Amino acid sequence: MELKTFAFLQIAAFIALGVQIFFVGTDALGDEDQLFSVEYCGTNCTQQDDGKWTPCSGKNGKCKCYHEDGKRYGLCLYTEYTDFSQYPNPEGSEIENTRPRP
């Protein structure tokens, strides 16, 4: 009896977790106020014998080395996060002022 109750509770917990993950995932897909972009800088980076990583150049020094744990090589990537929710929506008069004048 106790085993059946425990199994039932486990199944209920997994179902609740699955529903939660589904709703969080679909909510994140509809979030258009945030943008996260990644660009390859055209170079790779390697770990030297002293443990330091070779520097990444490009994008005015904003490229960083990203690598997996235990690997001695990685990619130089430029990442940028933009939160558009911090900017107000333009109003009609602001849009009219941006039109080219004859």
From Swiss-Prot:
Where in the sequence does glycosylation occur per the annotation?
Answer: 44
List GO molecular-function terms, semicolon-separated. C-X-C chemokine binding
Does this entry carry the keyword Glycoprotein?
yes
Q: Does the keyword Lyase apply?
A: no
Keywords for the protein's UniProt record, in alphabetical order? Disulfide bond, Glycoprotein, Secreted, Signal
Predominant subcellular localization, coarse grouping = secreted
This protein's GO cellular component annotations are: extracellular region
Localization, UniProt: Secreted
Disulfide linkage: 41-63, 45-65, 56-76
Task: State the function annotated in the UniProt record.
Answer: Salivary chemokine-binding protein which binds to host chemokines CXCL1 and CXCL8.
Name of this protein: Evasin P1170
Q: Which organism is it from?
A: Ixodes ricinus (Common tick)
